[in-house]
Structures are given as C-alpha cells and as structure tokens.
Regions:
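C-terminal structural segments of small proteins and small subunits
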Residues: 44-74
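A structural micro-motif recognizing beta-strand termini
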Residues: 17-20
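Short alpha-helix capping/helix-loop boundary micro-motifs
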Residues: 23-26
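Absolute protein N-terminus
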Residues: 1-2
Length: 74
C-alpha cells in the first residue's frame, strides 16, 4: 500500500521509497526513510497535498510523492 492510499489519522511504517535521483533524496532528507512511522494528519479537499507527521514534524507532500512511499499499515 502507498502513503497516498492512507486515510486521515491512519499510520504506516515505511517499507521502501520508490523513485530515484533528487526526488528520492528530498524524501530521505525530510526523514522519510525505511522503518519510519508516518501518520496522515489530513488531506486537502481534492486530495492534494497531504499533511503528514514524520518524526514529530508536520509537513505537506504532494500526492505524487506520497504514491512513491510504500508503507505497511499500523
């Protein structure tokens, strides 16, 4: 399942981050790495962007990025 499929207040453990290059590095720099727990806080009305909580920080990411983050639902 991808992070983009989680509903608000659902959490998932990152299994892997797909993609390559600058986009993947950016996600890693944001603390989104394997075995990290991510919680979806809320979604914009049309589903993009998604507000998430990672390592105690709240941030927004695009749905396109969220769909590259493979998670295991917690």
């Amino acid at each position: 399942m991808t992070l983009g499929n989680l509903k608000p207040n659902q959490s998932g453990k990152v299994v892997r981050v797909e993609g390559q290059g600058a986009n993947k590095k950016r996600l890693f720099d944001m603390g989104i790495t394997p075995n990290t727990i991510i919680k979806v806080k809320k979604r914009a009305p049309l589903g993009d962007p998604i507000e998430i909580e990672v390592r105690g920080y709240v941030m927004g990411i695009r749905k396109e990025e969220a769909n590259k983050i493979i998670v295991e639902v917690q």
